[in-house]
Structures are given as structure tokens and as C-alpha cells.
Amino acid sequence: MMPKVISLRPLKDFYDLDVYPSKDITVMELGASSTLLKQEILQSDGIILPAVGSKLDSSLFEGSKIKLIQVTGAGFDRLNVAELSALGIPVANIPGGSASAVSEYVVSVALSLLRNLNYCTKSII
């Protein structure tokens, strides 16, 4: 039987980057609020989880055969990693994936504040 992975991130996000799953894996796209989520978790081997969204209760994973939860960002805010560890489920993230974007944002906001650009915009409007 092929491993089954649930993606709570739209598969289109991956396809747009020319990233496709192996033919040896079944990937099912679900929304975090799907009524099928608990049922599918019990039958799946892994989950791809976007970094942004509502928290997922650890009880969803009790009795599951999940071998890995992969977060597609740096943070673990959506999960209780300690509770998942107690269930034997490792959680992985992608630290530094958006570091350059964050640094660019910080520099642009700092320049905006130094140049009073937000006040200029208000006076134009």
C-alpha cells in the first residue's frame, strides 16, 4: 500500500513551483476545517501543514499512524510540539525559508520611518 500524505496547503502552491509528489505517494489536499480531517489523519502517514492558520488540537492525532508533520514555514505556532512528541510524532519545519524576505521588509520599514513616508502618504490622501 502506498504511503498517504495529507496536504493542508493547496497543492497548487507546489505545482506553481514545478514541485510534484513522487508517484509512490498518494497526496490528498484538505482544508484545516474539513469534516474529513480527523478521519483522514487516522489513515495517513504524514501531513504537510502551512505555517499560517488556526491551531490544530493534538487530540486529532491520537491513535493515528502519522510518522511526520512537515510545517512549510519556520514556526510551530499551530501545533503543541510537546504533546505531539509524547504521541511519538515528529514535527519538522523550514527555518530560514523566508529570512531574506523578512530582512528586506525590516529594512524597507526602517527607511520608511526614517524618511517619514507614512506621513507623506497621509498628506497626499
Walk through the language-model features, giving the residues of each.
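An N-terminal-biased, well-structured beta-alpha scaffold segment characteristic
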Residues: M2-P90
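Phosphate-binding beta-alpha-beta segment of Rossmann-like dinucleotide-binding domains, i.e.
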Residues: L87-I89, P95-I125
